[in-house]
Amino acid sequence: MQVKNILGHRNQFMVIDDDGAVHFQSYDTHMAEITEIVGSEMLQLRMLSNYWSVTTAKHFKVWLEENRLWLAVAELIDHKVFKNLKDFMERVDIMQVSRFKVYVEFTDKDGNSNNYKLSLVGEE
């Protein structure tokens, strides 16, 4: 297991476990994990806590960038699925990203479960 502070902040961690899953922890809260879906080239982000703060969001964005998922989140924001990173962090349950597609399960503003599929630029 590897533990790394993000941006040198002593309470924002990226943890890589022995199975290859990458976790984001803010203080004592396990916020999210990224795993590779076996048998595919797809990454899955699972939000374990839908907490948001300015400090946590800043470090969460860096964590997403380091794990090649920020561009998928930015596309969802550009397509108005989410207003901003805060909205994403507060409402997402699962996001799956492949080379050309993003699939996200989230809670809408009325508390209902919803999903959205997005084809990324460059799809053949």
Regions found by a protein language model. Name each.
Residues 1-124:
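Terminal leader/tail segments of proteins
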